[in-house]
A protein has these predicted regions:
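Beta->alpha turn/N-cap motifs
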Residues: 2-8, 55, 74, 144, ...
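Short phosphate-binding/catalytic loops that engage adenosine nucleotides
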Residues: 136
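A mature extracytoplasmic/lumenal domain signature
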Residues: 24, 35-37, 114-116, 142-144
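Extracellular/periplasmic solute-recognition and catalytic clefts
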Residues: 1-37, 60, 160, 164
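Short helix-initiation/N-cap motifs at beta->coil->alpha
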Residues: 4-7, 116-118, 140-150
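Short Pro/Gly-enriched coil loops immediately N-terminal to beta-strands
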Residues: 22-28, 74-75, 180-181
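Acidic-aromatic pocket-rim loops
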Residues: 72-73, 147-181
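Append "and occasionally in soluble cytosolic enzymes with long acidic Gly/Pro-rich linkers
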Residues: 14, 21, 40-132
Length: 181
């Protein structure tokens, strides 16, 4: 069945009429940061956000453990994949230190704009809780796809957004100067 959510898998596994095969995906779910906005234009703030997030906990909370942490737009099994998860590892103390170095007074208030998909809404809850531990108050803004496409993607009206990329890894997509990040 297409579009089976991770939380639906157990009902299929428990039914002898179905054989469940779980495999990898080329989808990449990312937390996009609008680096055109202050204070997100400071790389220390972006690194602090990355260090505040436990990717494994997000996968567990939003995907019931189905998924693998990544540190870039490459997924395990993709041509040229290099594990970069250690570049910005989960480290709460480092996150707090980077925020202080950037001169950020906490609480730092940001908006996390979420499309209507379960991975985004559930992942958003986990990320909001993790960011709070370092003094970042992320308010979720749940939007429908049309709003996300025009406001977030089109007009770059967001601080943070959680989105899955499923398009082919095509340099033409990622080299667009006005791509939403």
């Amino acid at each position: 069945f297409p579009r089976v959510t991770p939380r639906s898998v157990p009902q299929f596994k428990s039914n002898p009429r179905f054989q469940v095969l779980v495999s990898g995906s080329r989808a990449k779910t990312i937390l996009a940061i609008n680096n055109a906005r202050k204070p997100l234009d400071d790389v220390r703030v972006r690194r602090a956000i990355a260090a505040a997030i436990d990717r494994k906990a997000v996968i567990e909370g939003a995907g019931d453990g189905y998924g693998a942490p990544i540190g870039s737009h490459y997924v395990p099994g993709a041509f040229g994949y290099v594990d970069t998860t250690g570049v910005n590892p989960f480290d709460i103390e480092k996150s707090k230190k980077l925020l202080a170095e950037a001169g950020i007074k906490t609480p730092l208030e940001l908006t996390l704009t979420l499309p209507p998909t379960p991975y985004a809404r559930q992942g958003g809850e986990v990320i909001v809780a993790q960011l709070a531990k370092v003094g970042i108050v992320a308010k979720t803004q749940n939007v429908e796809w049309a709003q996300w496409l025009s406001g977030t993607y089109g007009n770059k009206n967001y601080d943070l957004t959680l989105i899955s990329h499923v398009e082919p890894f095509d340099l033409a997509n990622f080299a667009k100067p006005d791509y939403y990040w």
